[in-house]
């Protein structure tokens, strides 16, 4: 039997067909369908453009048979920054797309994708100095040298020795 299909409309007005079981990886969409039922009308996704929405749907399609997320109680999974190989390849995108995927996953309440996106950013930061992190994310240092010294002294206890 064919899987029912929904239509998402991206913020830039593009209609994208999505299998219902794929769409329901989004807790937001799943709850909406449970509350309102399926109307056959396109579902507007106002905060997500076509390119990002297609990436999110690609991830959801790959993970559609994963067990549902159990919520925040799985501490061991959250504490690791390990990412499976498919997800690592999926997240090999430019920084702007990576951050857009994270924002979309948060908006659509797709916990697994949000975790993978955040772990990807964590791995980009891991082991880097503040200067290297600023360079990676193109962040301007707005501290004076005196302020920076004071912050280093106040946080000496947290430094790796």
UniProtKB/Swiss-Prot annotation:
What is the name of the protein in this document?
A: E3 ubiquitin ligase complex SCF subunit sconC
User: Which parts of the chain are coiled coil?
Assistant: none
**Pathway membership, UniProt:** Protein modification; protein ubiquitination
UniProt record similarity statement: Belongs to the SKP1 family.
Keywords linked to the UniProt accession: Ubl conjugation pathway
Signal sequence annotation: none
* Segments for region (Interaction with the F-box domain of F-box proteins): 102-161
Chain's role: Essential component of the SCF (SKP1-CUL1-F-box protein) E3 ubiquitin ligase complexes, which mediate the ubiquitination and subsequent proteasomal degradation of target proteins. Controls sulfur metabolite repression, probably by mediating the inactivation or degradation of the metR transcription factor.
Per the record, the domain of life is Eukaryota
**What is annotated about its quaternary structure and interactions?**
Component of the SCF (SKP1-CUL1-F-box protein) E3 ubiquitin ligase complexes.
Q: Which organism is it from?
A: Aspergillus oryzae (strain ATCC 42149 / RIB 40) (Yellow koji mold)
């Amino acid at each position: 039997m064919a899987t029912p299909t929904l239509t998402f409309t991206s913020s830039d007005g593009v209609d994208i067909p999505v299998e219902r079981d794929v769409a329901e990886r989004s807790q937001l969409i799943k709850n909406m369908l449970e509350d309102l039922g399926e109307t056959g009308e396109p579902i507007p996704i106002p905060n997500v453009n076509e390119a990002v929405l297609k990436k999110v749907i690609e991830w959801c399609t790959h993970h559609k048979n994963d067990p549902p997320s159990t919520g925040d109680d799985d501490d061991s999974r959250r504490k690791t920054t390990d990412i499976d190989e498919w997800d690592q390849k999926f997240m090999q995108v430019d920084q702007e797309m990576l951050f857009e995927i994270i924002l979309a996953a948060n908006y659509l309440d797709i916990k697994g994708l949000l975790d993978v996106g955040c772990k990807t950013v964590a791995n980009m930061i891991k082991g880097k100095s503040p200067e290297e992190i600023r360079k990676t994310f193109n962040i301007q240092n707005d501290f004076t040298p005196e302020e920076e010294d004071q912050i280093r002294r106040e946080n000496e206890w947290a430094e790796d020795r």
